[in-house]
Amino acid sequence: FNAVEGNTTFYARPAPATVARWAQVMPEHFRFTAKFPRDISHEGDLRDQLEPAFDFTRLMAPLGRRVAPYWLQLQASFGPARLAELDQFLQQIGVPVAVEVRHPAFFAKGEEERALNRLLHACGVERVCLDPRALFSCTSRDPAVLHAQAKKPKVPPRPAAFSQHPQVRFIGHPQLEANEPFLTPWVEKVGAWIEEGRSPYIFLHTSDNRLSAALAQRFHQRLMQRLPGLAALPELPRAPEVEQLGLL
């Protein structure tokens, strides 16, 4: 795989030595979508968080272009009345950013959602598309499933391509075959984006992420059928989770 969601930075800033180690082991082509820490995205006016945000981007600077884009995940209480804050933050931050929103008004197909999309499009900023439908179709009482359903917002997918790099988070069903009908529209959408010359970022999860790699391989195999000539994924190492834990 050639990209990973940087969820760890949402909860805690890495030490400079950790960032230096990441810079040593990450290939130049690898992409790390580092999330702004939650004290930046979830506490107070975004305009007041610009200096901490600059500090964070300076911390991550040793990774260079491998951090692209940064993700700004906004809480569900961040609504249309605060778009002016978001606009100023995006105008001044100075690094590639993608934004994930969770307020219901931004999924209502009304003027408030259109205003958000206009703002992001004007800034060349992607709207992160979360698709949790497969997860919420699951009726299992497994604790991992229930935990994931409690954490993820039940929002409709909003595919967007405001730049060369559309961003998709697909939260899957724990039974791989149950994801097929939910993956089908994404195979077509992602295939069309690639044909347009875009390079989408597609992140696939399962409730406990043990099958995430298998789900990603399944999706890529279908994408290869949609796009003849698309290169196959390299074979996974036997214990990828151990390597990733060492990285993070």
Q: Where do the language-model regions lie?
A:
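Residues lining hydrophobic/aromatic ligand-binding pockets adjacent to catalytic sites
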Residues: 1-248
